[in-house]
Amino acid sequence: MEALRQRIEAAFEARAEITPNSVEPSVRADVEKAISMLDKGEARVAEKIDGQWHVHQWLKKAVLLSFRIFDNGVIDGGETKYFDKVPMKFADYDEARFKEEAIRVVPPATVRKGSFIGKNTVLMPSYVNLGAYVDEGTMVDTWATVGSCAQIGKNVHLSGGVGIGGVLEPLQAGPTIIEDNCFIGARSEVVEGVIVEEGSVISMGVYLGQSTRIYDRETGEVHYGRVPAGSVVVSGTLPSKCGTYNLYAAIIVKKVDAKTRGKVGINELLRIVD
């Protein structure tokens, strides 16, 4: 894999000269290999190593190169047709393969090739972009969007209309990450590389970006870009420094461990007790 990484890095430096007609066959083959690895889950844009998330920038570069290398083509879509550079992940699947991978895909869910979908995953009418990683046992509910290179953990529930932001550029930006056993409430948005740590519950209509203040009401701490593990988060406001107005904030109203979360329903966790 190291040799492939080096070749992708070199091709990316020369990307300005690359077109679908001029690309070297070896470069095309390398990019296709990288996309295939992402598609199969053999590689991922980000992975947790020794408790820390590490981003493999060369895989993001491979995704960006694919847009320069591949030309638009007609894509069959049931009752209609599409015209794009990226084919659909399930275009060649048959009944046996869906059963083998234990994936449910409800029309008109759209999943682009180069994204990984784990076993026992349910995709309601939703969208998963290339480079994304959706782990086992996850539900992507109706009109939810998983952006490019986003990382979704095991047994996650992305409720209706949830937006998980994609990050391809700038290259130094990390992907948005939802760790294992999280619940993201309807119409919430998690973007700009925010990390929602394991076992957290995000209420309906919470918006999390790098500049969002995430206030822990029990400790008074303010977090940016990270929701600590086991947090229960709702929308709220915090006063301005001058005290004349309030600005949006996400409020951590309580912390729960896995044992408590397993015994108590999501709705019960979201009931705020003053």
Swiss-Prot record:
Keywords: Acyltransferase, Amino-acid biosynthesis, Cytoplasm, Diaminopimelate biosynthesis, Lysine biosynthesis, Repeat, Transferase. The keyword Transcription does not apply. Substrate binds at residues 104, 141. Coiled coil: none annotated. GO terms for molecular function: 2,3,4,5-tetrahydropyridine-2,6-dicarboxylate N-succinyltransferase activity; nucleotidyltransferase activity. It is found in: Cytoplasm. Its EC number is 2.3.1.117. Its main location: cytoplasm. InterPro entries: DapD_Trfase_Hexpep_rpt_fam, Hexapep, Hexapep_transf_CS, THP_succinylTrfase_dom1, THP_succinylTrfase_N_sf, Trimer_LpxA-like_sf. One of its GO terms (biological process) is lysine biosynthetic process via diaminopimelate. It holds the Pfam family Hexapep_2. GO terms for cellular component: cytoplasm. It catalyses: (S)-2,3,4,5-tetrahydrodipicolinate + succinyl-CoA + H2O = (S)-2-succinylamino-6-oxoheptanedioate + CoA. Pathway: Amino-acid biosynthesis; L-lysine biosynthesis via DAP pathway; LL-2,6-diaminopimelate from (S)-tetrahydrodipicolinate (succinylase route): step 1/3. HAMAP family: DapD (MF_00811). Belongs to the transferase hexapeptide repeat family. Homotrimer. This is 2,3,4,5-tetrahydropyridine-2,6-dicarboxylate N-succinyltransferase. It comes from Shewanella sediminis (strain HAW-EB3). The lineage of its organism: Bacteria, Pseudomonadati, Pseudomonadota, Gammaproteobacteria, Alteromonadales.
